[in-house]
């Protein structure tokens, strides 16, 4: 196996008398999708900051590929409603890019039609896609997504997960997703890491929910409520959730969410929402 893009070894960190990271080891390889799940206060954001070099650990080491390009997409972007800023302007705030370059990345994320729209007018799904487009201008090798489906409806969530998988394959970039959402984990995640100041357990989504530490952390009812199911679409939805091809029937009421159906593809894990707004940044680490 090739060397990881980024690797944390035995990371330990305390804030005063409180231990927030306890001997954490985690590695991320090119083309891999990892979802980090855990309750509020578990230290997920602190772990990510430590891996990215924004927080120094008390003990342990972080190894990064030389010149690693990292793109970060926050939970949401707080922009004043009265501040005039088009999507094109937002994409070029901290980097130079021509209009054709902006149109290309927006097209890749299914949002080419909003290039001249005001940022304040975008829906939750459109905002997430625009922020993804902004990171693609950097050609990231590692894409870090903090609660990527927050504020996005169920149809939009499925679309974002398909988009993330497409980006992973097209750009051969690794993806690290942070989630408080225990019911909804992307089915194509290569590894789910259950985290509460230390790595409780890890593996593919179907097996993590059976792990004793997972069930202990989130409770038996929450663990049993998780059902990852797979469906195949015979139609597509646009960014607003409207059917744009194939069958125009709304399948959302045709099936119980606890079993498989032949016409959809979704993944389910549980939610606790963190509503703190954060600013988008992209960092390049040497």
Where are each of the predicted segments found?
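Conserved ABC ATPase "signature" region
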Residues: 99-114
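Conserved ABC ATPase signature
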Residues: 118-122, 126
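Conserved catalytic motifs of ABC-family nucleotide-binding domains
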Residues: 139
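Catalytic Walker B motif of ABC-type/P-loop ATPase nucleotide-binding domains
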Residues: 143-147
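H-loop/switch region of ABC-family ATPase nucleotide-binding domains
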Residues: 179-180
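H-loop (His-switch) and adjacent beta-strand-loop-beta switch element
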Residues: 192-204
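ABC ATPase nucleotide-binding domains
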Residues: 210, 217-286
């Amino acid at each position: 196996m090739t060397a990881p893009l980024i690797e944390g070894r035995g990371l330990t960190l305390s804030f005063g008398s409180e231990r927030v990271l306890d001997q954490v080891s985690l590695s991320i390889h090119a083309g891999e999708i990892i979802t980090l799940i855990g309750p509020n206060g578990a230290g997920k954001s602190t772990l990510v900051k430590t891996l990215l070099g924004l927080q120094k650990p008390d003990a342990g080491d972080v190894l990064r590929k030389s010149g690693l390009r990292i793109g970060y997409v926050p939970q949401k972007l707080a922009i004043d409603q009265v501040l005039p800023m088009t999507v094109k302007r937002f994409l070029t705030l901290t980097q130079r890019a021509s209009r054709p370059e902006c149109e290309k990345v927006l097209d890749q994320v299914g949002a080419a039609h909003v290039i001249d729209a005001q940022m304040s007018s975008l829906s939750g799904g459109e905002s997430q896609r625009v922020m993804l487009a902004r990171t693609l201008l950097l050609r990231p090798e590692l894409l870090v997504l903090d609660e990527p489906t927050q504020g996005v409806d169920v149809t939009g969530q499925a679309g974002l997960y398909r988009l993330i998988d497409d980006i992973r394959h097209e750009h051969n970039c690794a993806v690290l997703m942070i989630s408080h959402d225990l019911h909804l984990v992307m089915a194509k995640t290569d590894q789910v890491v259950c985290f509460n100041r230390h790595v409780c357990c890890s593996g593919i989504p179907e097996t993590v929910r059976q792990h004793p530490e997972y069930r202990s952390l989130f409770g038996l009812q929450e663990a049993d409520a998780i059902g990852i199911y797979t469906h195949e679409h015979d139609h597509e939805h646009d960014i607003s959730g409207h059917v744009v091809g194939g069958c125009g029937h709304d399948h959302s009421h045709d099936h119980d969410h606890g079993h498989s159906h032949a016409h959809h593809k979704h993944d389910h894990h549980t939610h606790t929402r963190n509503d703190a707004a954060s600013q988008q940044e992209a960092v390049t680490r040497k």
